[in-house]
């Protein structure tokens, strides 16, 4: 007789494992199916390992500028294999902790590939194939790097890399090409440039970081090029050839050769061969599974979360969707709210944004005021030697409600949370500038930007005469 569960989650990434934990804590008998490692792409092949390498690169950058702080270092070397080993240790430690959390919540884990065979049955293809019954199912199958047309990622072409393979390089490339100037492409460009690689980024459009915010795109393009990263915008790659000891690219008809090529042109959704048709779940031509605000698909007892919903390809969005789905299965009436989703780019410097951009506000006909306050007027940033950059607040012109924000500069990834909370709770500018911010801190930049919006800045001249 097949084992029965209240909730079965297919995929143990940041959406799936959070959904499983939430369901189990709500008293549901829960199963979690994963064919690889707990934590999914984020923990094992994405967010965490790349940030571990970026942490090492940040120390390299600090050493190079140590003389500005009165510290003179006579020569240093980069042990890249040791950096990679540290990255692996970080991932393994977090994964071990995650497996412990799953066990402590009494979640039954099945190792294998989950596939629907009906709306209430899941087949597990693993060492010992089995079928389990499910009252409710959450699909959290994620996505994979998209390959360059006609050039699949394989061990036969170790110099043509995806975002997974690039994390396991044995050496720092002398000369590296990155196809795609989006978030992932720019993060790796920043990483390897800092480590000493000669980096070229090839982007088909006329701007990098297409976030519907031209200010971010232009500012970061200027910073990257000033630091020495080469960009080819409006460029088309027609062929990639693995020559054994190098890779040959044809770019706009011109041939260039590199040690390694990173292909970063988006991700392919994992919605094929998971039995959607057998359960009656609708999926569009892109592989997206439509859901309502409770994360329910067209089949009432089947939910979908994460990349496959076609919303935001962000781990924290997947996690929140997982919470919403699990709580609805448990009988609550939760709905997802995408009004305040923070997005972070882990480059040097960091970039973060949330809510409406000036462009999206204009497109929606919303009258807004955009105020940008520079870090060079923030004492802590100057003391840290990181005064380049700014924080911008987008507020409604009349009501002063905060509708969006973006920040380029030190610790942007952490700073964005204050404005995320403000947007989520429909706060206004006075809620920020009337709040006492600790001094000296980087967070003061938000109070100053809010004051600037009402033309009463404390640490820069007002605009009125």
From Swiss-Prot:
Major localization listed first in the record, in broad terms: cytoplasm
Binding-site positions, NAD(+): 180-184, 203, 237, 264-267
Single GO cellular component term: cytoplasm
Subcellular location: Cytoplasm
Disulfide-bond pairs as recorded: 42-47
Record text on cofactor binding: Binds 1 FAD per subunit.
Protein's recorded name: Dihydrolipoyl dehydrogenase
Organism taxonomic ancestry: Bacteria, Pseudomonadati, Chlamydiota, Chlamydiia, Chlamydiales
Gene: lpdA
